[in-house]
Amino acid sequence: MSHIYTSADQLIGNTPLLELTHIEQAFQLKARILAKLEYFNPAGSVKDRIAKSMIDEAERTGQLKPGSVIIEPTSGNTGIGLASAAAARGYRLILVMPETMSVERRQLMKAYGAELVLTEGEKGMKGAIAKAEELASEIPNSFLPGQFINPSNPKAHRETTGPEIYQDTDGAVDIFVAGVGTGGTITGVGEYLKSKKPDVQIVAVEPASSAVLSTGVAGAHKIQGIGAGFVPDVLNQTIYDEIIPVEDQKAFETGRLMARQEGVLVGISSGAALWAAMEVAKRREIEGKTIVVLLADTGDRYLSTPLFADPD
């Protein structure tokens, strides 16, 4: 029987789990680490899931209709996912992004036909959000999905990512590790997994130099895609059991390690999440348990960054 898809968004989800056997052996880890490889989504990241979810819901409720203009602040991946979806559905898309994000992200957005507005890097995501809201107030028939406040964000992960992890491990997942950007992934996956297995441990990962969740103090950092500098509305702060701050350099080193040990190219936030997962996997009390770490995107969009530019 043939299995032929008719739109790119039908390809979203059902991403594979890869056991990191080489890293487990090299570092003599006590636990299994399974990596959820989100770059298998058609536009290359976990954010494809929420792009589809937010657009589907907006079309269902009539907020989006033919001729609408989508405007969204993004650190990159949500913008790329929205650009793919908007192209396929015929919407004009304006993305607002801090100028400090990688040049590859800018190029990818434009490649899908999106318009790009850059904001001052020092203002971070707050600056991008403010500019997007300003544009939305000026442009007729505009729709602002608002990934940081939109309940369709965590909903996508409750309905897809969480069930996929539970099913693919036959319910054997003991610990889930993910970086926190909007908070949608860890909220949706965490809520689903705890509904099926209440003793599952949820570990949040954030940049050490902008450890808002653990210290309340925001700052500049280089781990693109996580650490927005504030606590997003969609983040369920009761869902995680532990917060692990990660230094920028550890994220870079571990991202390169993934490429060189496992032959899998992932991004900076994936390096941060994997470093945290490896730290958990070294604990004696974790022996024999199964850790699932979500690796949010591909490393292709970071070739110009310290992740791969002049690596050690």
Language-model region placement:
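PLP-dependent amino-acid enzyme catalytic core
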Residues: 1-312
